Amino acid sequence: MGVTVETIQPGDGKNFPKKGDTVTMHYTGTLQNGSVFDSSVRRNEPFVTQIGVGRVIKGWDEGVLQLSLGQKANLICTPDYAYGPRGFPPVIPPNATLNFEVELLKIN
């Protein structure tokens, strides 16, 4: 249970976000069956958020803190680190394990 980080492309290995930092990243979220439910890449608009402070799902709050600048990775979030038993109707079903391909573009 939790979040698993699988590196696709390494980052700089030096610059990591800290709790409270604002990060800019691209992501594509998929369900276990491979269907895409959201993508900043498709919108061509990077996602900006404060990380580690509860503004995003727990899987992101913990997973993104493990990424270094420029890193591309899969964040695999179990339901307890995603949307849990409620899901996010109608897009995400209850108790869904989610996969996010993320790229950390900037740490502000």
From Swiss-Prot:
It catalyses: [protein]-peptidylproline (omega=180) = [protein]-peptidylproline (omega=0). It comes from the Eukaryota. Keywords: Cytoplasm, Isomerase, Rotamase. GO terms for molecular function: peptidyl-prolyl cis-trans isomerase activity. Its EC number is 5.2.1.8. SUPFAM superfamilies: FKBP-like. Residues 20-108 form the PPIase FKBP-type domain. Inhibited by both FK506 and rapamycin. Pfam families: FKBP_C. InterPro entries: FKBP-type_PPIase, PPIase_dom_sf, PPIase_FKBP_dom. One of its GO terms (cellular component) is cytoplasm. The keyword Electron transport does not apply. Its main location: cytoplasm. Residues 1-20 are annotated as: Disordered. Belongs to the FKBP-type PPIase family. FKBP1 subfamily. PPIases accelerate the folding of proteins. It catalyzes the cis-trans isomerization of proline imidic peptide bonds in oligopeptides. This is FK506-binding protein 1. It comes from Rhizopus delemar (strain RA 99-880 / ATCC MYA-4621 / FGSC 9543 / NRRL 43880) (Mucormycosis agent).
